[in-house]
C-alpha cells in the first residue's frame, strides 16, 4: 500500500517537472487538481484503519482555500497524524441528603442513623451477641472501639447471678443541640430515655436523659455514618481502649471484681444493731424515687461539677432521718462538707463517724443490703459512684442475688447492680444514729 502511494507521488512530481521543462503555461499549484486526484485515489484504496489520512487531506484543503501557504511535496511521504478526541472530565456529584426535615431539626436519615445505633446497641447487649446494622460507622476503628465496649458489657452481664438478657426495650430521644460543621458533617447532642425489661426481673429498669454526642458524616454514596460517639452511660466514660490489641484494657480487673463479689454470695449476714433513732428506709426509698429523674431545688445540683450522685445519696439518707452533723451537712451552696457531695469523702466520714453521728457498717457482706442502703462503686476502688438500693432481688431460696438501684448522674431507676461496668462495689449499711452519751454531754 505504501509503495503505491510513493509511486503515485513520484508520477505527479515527474508530470510537474515535465511541464516546467516545456515552459507550459499550465503551471499547477501542488495543492490543487493533481494532488486532489491522487488523494482521492489513495482514499479509494485505503482500508478503514487508515481513514485518518483522508481527514488530514481535508484539513490541508481547507487551509489552501483560506489562503494559507502549503509546502511543496516532499520526496518521501509525511507520517500520518492521528487526531484523538478527548472528553472534558466530569465533575463528581456532591453527596446530598434528600430526606425530609423533622420538627426537631434533624433529617429523617440523620435521625434513623441514631436509632439504628441504639437498636444495634440494645440488641447486642440484650442478646449477649454483637450485631451491627449495615453502614452504621464511618470507619473500622470507630466500629472496633464501640463493639469492644459492647462486648465488655456483655462479659459483665453474663456473670450476673440473675438473667440479664433484655426481653424488651423502648427508647425515646430528645434532640438538645445540632451543630452543622459542613454540608457533610454534623454534631448532634441527644438525650435518651429507655425502659428495659430484663429476663430475670419482674419490673422495668429505667434510664432517664442519658446524654449522647454523635458526629455524623455524609459519605460519597449520600449515606450518613457515625464517625464519633460519646455517652454519659457507664462504661463509655471510664472505658480504656487498647487500640494495639483491639481490647478493653480494664476488662481483667472488671471481671476479677465480679468473682470476688460473687464469692460473698451465701455468706454470713450480721444481725442489724439496735439504735436510738432507726433509719426510716421507706421514707428514704420514697425520696429516692421522687428525685431520681429530677433535682430538689433546696439543694445545689452538681451534675456539671463531676456528678450529682453523692449529693443525691446524702439527701436520701437525710430524708430517711439521718441527721446532719459537723462532719456531714449541706447548709447552702457556699457552706457544706465535702463528705456530702463526694464519694471518697463520704466513705471516710462513714468509716470514722461515732454512733451519735451515724451508725453504719462499711464492711458488711455484700449480699446483706436492704432498701435505703448505699452501694458505692468504681473499678480500681469503690469511690467513683454512689447509688441507693431501692429493692432487693432474691432467688428461690430467699437469698439476695442482686439489687435494684436508683441514682443521679446517670439517672437510673430499678437498675440492676450486676449490670454496671463499675464492678468494684461496696455495700454501706445504714442503721440510724444514737443519742449523744451522757459522758459526752458532761
Predicted feature locations:
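N-terminal, intrinsically disordered, polar/charged segments of Gram-positive cell-envelope systems
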Residues: 26-121
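Surface-exposed, charged secondary-structure patches
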Residues: 151-201
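C-terminal motif of bacterial Sec signal peptides marking the signal peptidase cleavage site
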Residues: 18-21
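...with weaker cross-activation on analogous glycine-rich loops/strands in unrelated enzymes
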Residues: 185, 333-405
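Short beta-strand edge/turn micro-motifs at domain boundaries
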Residues: 207-262, 403-406
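Low-complexity, Gly/Ser/Thr/Pro-rich intrinsically disordered linker/tail segments
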Residues: 404-409, 417-442
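N-terminal capping segments
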Residues: 102, 257-338
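Core segments of small alpha/beta cavity-forming domains
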Residues: 93-163, 290, 297-301, 312-320
Amino acid at each position: 500500500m505504501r509503495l503505491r502511494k510513493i509511486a503515485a507521488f513520484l508520477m505527479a512530481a515527474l508530470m510537474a517537472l515535465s511541464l516546467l521543462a516545456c515552459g507550459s503555461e499550465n503551471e499547477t499549484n501542488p495543492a490543487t487538481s493533481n494532488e486532489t486526484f491522487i488523494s482521492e485515489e489513495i482514499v479509494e484504496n485505503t482500508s478503514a484503519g487508515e481513514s485518518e489520512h483522508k481527514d488530514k487531506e481535508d484539513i490541508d484543503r481547507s487551509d489552501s482555500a483560506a489562503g494559507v501557504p502549503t509546502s511543496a511535496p516532499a520526496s518521501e511521504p509525511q507520517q500520518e497524524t492521528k487526531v484523538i478526541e478527548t472528553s472534558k472530565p466530569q465533575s463528581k456529584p456532591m453527596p446530598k441528603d434528600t430526606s425530609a426535615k423533622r420538627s426537631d431539626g434533624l433529617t429523617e436519615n440523620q435521625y434513623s442513623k441514631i436509632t439504628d445505633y441504639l437498636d444495634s446497641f440494645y440488641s447486642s447487649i440484650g442478646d449477649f451477641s454483637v450485631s451491627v446494622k449495615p453502614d452504621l460507622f464511618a470507619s473500622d476503628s470507630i466500629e472496633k472501639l464501640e463493639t469492644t465496649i459492647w462486648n465488655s458489657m456483655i462479659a459483665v452481664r453474663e456473670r450476673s447471678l440473675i438473667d440479664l438478657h433484655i426481653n424488651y426495650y423502648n427508647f425515646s430521644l430528645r434532640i438538645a443541640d445540632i451543630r452543622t460543621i459542613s454540608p457533610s458533617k454534623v454534631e448532634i447532642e441527644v438525650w435518651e430515655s429507655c425502659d428495659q425489661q430484663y429476663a430475670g426481673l419482674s419490673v422495668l429498669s429505667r434510664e432517664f436523659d442519658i446524654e449522647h454526642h454523635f458526629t455524623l458524616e455524609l459519605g460519597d454514596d449520600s449515606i450518613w455514618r457515625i464517625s464519633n460517639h460519646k455517652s454519659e452511660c457507664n462504661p463509655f466514660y471510664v472505658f480504656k481502649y487498647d487500640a494495639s490489641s483491639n481490647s478493653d484494657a480494664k476488662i481483667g480487673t472488671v471481671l476479677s471484681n465480679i468473682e470476688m463479689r460473687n464469692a460473698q454470695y451465701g455468706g454470713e449476714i450480721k444481725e442489724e444493731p439496735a439504735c436510738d433513732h432507726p433509719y426510716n428506709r421507706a421514707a428514704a426509698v420514697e425520696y429516692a424515687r421522687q428525685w431520681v429523674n429530677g433535682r430538689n431545688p433546696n439543694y445545689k445540683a452538681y451534675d456539671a461539677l463531676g456528678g450529682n450522685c453523692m449529693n443525691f445519696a446524702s439527701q436520701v439518707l437525710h430524708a430517711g432521718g439521718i441527721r446532719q452533723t459537723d462532719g456531714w451537712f449541706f447548709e447552702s451552696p457556699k457552706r457544706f462538707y465535702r463528705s456530702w457531695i463526694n464519694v471518697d469523702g463520704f466513705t471516710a466520714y462513714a468509716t470514722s463517724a461515732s454512733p451519735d453521728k451515724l451508725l453504719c457498717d462499711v464492711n458488711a457482706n455484700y449480699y446483706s443490703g436492704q432498701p435505703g442502703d448505699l452501694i458505692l462503686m468504681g473499678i480500681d476502688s469503690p469511690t467513683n459512684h454512689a447509688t441507693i438500693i431501692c429493692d432487693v432481688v432474691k432467688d428461690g431460696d430467699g437469698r439476695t442475688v442482686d439489687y435494684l438501684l436508683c441514682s443521679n448522674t446517670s439517672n437510673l431507676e430499678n437498675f440492676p447492680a450486676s449490670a454496671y461496668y463499675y464492678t468494684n462495689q461496696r455495700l454501706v449499711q445504714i442503721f440510724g444514729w444514737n443519742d449523744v452519751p451522757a459522758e459526752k454531754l458532761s
